């Protein structure tokens, strides 16, 4: 069997290569690549990430979605209720919060367990062998982590004693410093023996809760044990000559892709203003807590009736396709001594918590812009997705718009992009001419504009990464 991979994580390709002699399928490659990314892509993701999965099952010829995004604890009864706010120059200016009290319940291991039980063909010990090895022997930083750590290493990852010790080699040399996560290696061995559910019910869960409690966090054992995925809250939209499958809520990411597509394909000179209005509509109307799923579904029906993240996509020749985007926020800086797992800071992402820090979100699914999708047309089936915070939707929509015109994924990914911010300011890559707009132009292939990855099966397997995010792709 042949398998293809496209990713924004440099080490994911090495993970795929590590099992290539075992005749892996698309699920096998996705599992080992995702775990490896959570080890190596420090700050970009972490071993306490959450994700959204969209996939196509080649046996049943059906598409599905799984929402395993962060959920707030049922109560905020931990000792630390202070907002430990920090400021970083990453992406211009970012305010976020650090500490164990920003930790939300992650769902990535529910996805990995589901994939392993239903689609994997290789024993779990083999799938986790490479991430166990690299976490124990050590690794140098990939470029996206270097770019992030230039801004975040001191304020976010050096305040915590254990984290500061583990990352000590990076203090003076981001390029050559080696990170070793021996405790995380032990935890991965535990996963290989007991399965991913140990994160929610077993010894790993107990170790996490001990650290959370000792450091003032709010997540409890009950919060871990009662975490549930949301299956098949999806839409299936015919748009021009494409069929697009994605999440219909409570995540708002796919809704925003469709709305960006709608504006980008209008024949108007007022496109920039319409994109500014769309950005503000998202902030003002879509980012709320409550029944977002029903709201998002209604918004998608209206479209149908009117004309810090990682992404990994995998496909195989048995027509299985997996599109996974996952995140840990900006990272909390907390490194759990017993498990070697860095904690997420999803309760502390200020821009995604409009109710305020530790506001009325108890037990709620948090807000996500992620949008892993499946696209089908007469020529084949494809996975698409991107990291990039609030640029995820605009990046994917521009690539889809390009593909509708040129039917070439490589050209569609490589064409210059632009993004309209909340205040109407436009940022664009060189080579793009925006008439009557004062835009700030960046260099070609700027990582600001996401990293759209595509895999698929036409006459043969296909994979293409994005030069904005390391251009990682692989076919065995």
Describe the function of each predicted region.
Residues 259-327, 338-339, 439:
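Internal maturation/activation junctions in enzymes
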Residues 246-249, 255, 375-392:
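Extended C-terminal regions of large enzymes
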Residues 39-65, 218, 320-382, 405, ...:
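Active-site rim segments in enzyme catalytic domains, especially the processed small/beta chain
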């Amino acid at each position: 069997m042949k398998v293809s991979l496209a990713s924004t994580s440099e080490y994911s390709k090495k993970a795929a290569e590590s099992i290539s002699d075992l005749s892996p399928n698309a699920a096998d490659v996705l599992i080992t690549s995702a775990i490896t990314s959570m080890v190596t892509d420090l700050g970009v993701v972490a071993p306490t990430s959450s994700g959204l999965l969209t996939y196509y099952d080649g046996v049943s010829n059906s598409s599905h979605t799984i929402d395993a995004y962060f959920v707030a604890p049922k109560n905020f009864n931990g000792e630390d209720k202070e907002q430990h706010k920090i400021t970083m120059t990453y992406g211009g200016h970012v305010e976020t919060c650090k500490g164990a009290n920003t930790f939300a319940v992650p769902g990535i291991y529910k996805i990995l367990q589901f994939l392993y039980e239903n689609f994997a063909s290789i024993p779990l010990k083999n799938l986790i062998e490479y991430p166990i090895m690299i976490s124990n022997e050590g690794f140098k930083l990939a470029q996206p982590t270097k770019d992030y750590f230039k801004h975040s290493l001191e304020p976010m990852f050096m305040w915590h004693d254990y984290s500061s010790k583990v990352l000590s080699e990076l203090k003076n040399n981001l390029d050559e410093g080696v990170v070793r996560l021996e405790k995380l290696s032990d935890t991965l061995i535990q996963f290989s023996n007991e399965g991913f559910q140990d994160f929610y019910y077993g010894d790993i869960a107990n170790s996490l809760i001990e650290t959370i409690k000792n450091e003032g966090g709010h997540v409890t054992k009950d919060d871990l044990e009662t975490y549930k995925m949301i299956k098949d809250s999806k839409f299936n939209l015919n748009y021009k000559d494409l069929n697009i499958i994605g999440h219909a809520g409570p995540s708002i990411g796919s809704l925003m892709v469709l709305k960006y597509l709608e504006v980008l394909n209008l024949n108007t000179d007022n496109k920039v203003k319409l994109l500014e209005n769309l950005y503000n509509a998202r902030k003002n109307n879509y980012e709320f807590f409550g029944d977002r799923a029903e709201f998002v579904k209604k918004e998608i029906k209206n479209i149908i009736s009117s004309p810090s993240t990682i992404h990994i996509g995998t496909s195989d020749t048995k027509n299985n396709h997996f599109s996974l985007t996952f995140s840990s926020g900006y990272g909390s800086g907390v490194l759990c001594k017993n498990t070697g797992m860095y904690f997420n800071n999803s309760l502390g992402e200020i821009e995604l918590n409009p109710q305020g820090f530790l506001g009325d979100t108890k037990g709620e699914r948090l807000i996500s812009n992620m949008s892993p999708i499946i696209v089908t047309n007469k020529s084949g089936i494809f996975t698409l997705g991107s990291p990039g915070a609030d640029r995820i939707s605009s990046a994917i929509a521009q690539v889809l718009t390009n593909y509708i015109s040129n039917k070439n994924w490589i050209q569609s990914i490589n064409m210059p992009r632009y993004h309209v911010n909340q205040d109407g300011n436009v940022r664009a890559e060189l080579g793009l001419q925006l008439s009557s707009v004062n835009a700030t132009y960046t260099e070609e292939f700027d990582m600001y504009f996401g990293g759209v990855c595509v895999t698929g099966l036409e006459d043969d397997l296909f994979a293409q990464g994005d030069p904005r995010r390391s251009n990682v792709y692989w076919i065995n």
